[in-house]
């Protein structure tokens, strides 16, 4: 079928409340460039995909794409898992960027505690995903195993530096994840000697 039909079908599946949709992007496909990968992540985030997985193309023995690799301009490793090394449309360095981008997705978008904040950040600010990617790379964090708490602190620090208008949402995400109120993301939360008013307007949640 047509690509537009497939996208509409995916969008519909993502809209179903009783179904969690995992969408896969494959770096190294012919005609697929790095900038298009970034664009597709934003598209899938706008559909509210439950998870966005980014993997590298593998040319398995006996497959049609492997037989046509030279014709398609694909270079791949002769050793398992036979990953694509470069194509006419994406360089070896860009494939490494895509691998690191997949780490960002797993650390933040695919982690329930930080997913909604990450989604809102990258959708409301078209350059945010690039900024977050560079921030994690420059601080040598993107390829490190990090705890849920550490990832939350990093995201809060990123918002504080680059998108301060999201600090309240970052603090709320931190609290909802059950993190400590003594850590930096809860620095603006007042807990001592606080008396609730007799009446208040509920701005968030159900009470």
Tell where the protein language model's regions lie, with residue ranges:
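Generic alpha-helical secondary structure signal
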Residues: 4, 8, 35, 93-96, ...
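Aromatic-residue detector
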Residues: 25, 55, 77-83, 99, ...
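General N-terminal targeting signals
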Residues: 38-40, 66-71, 76, 101, ...
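C-terminal accessory region of radical SAM enzymes
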Residues: 80-116
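Radical SAM enzyme core and accessory elements
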Residues: 102-207
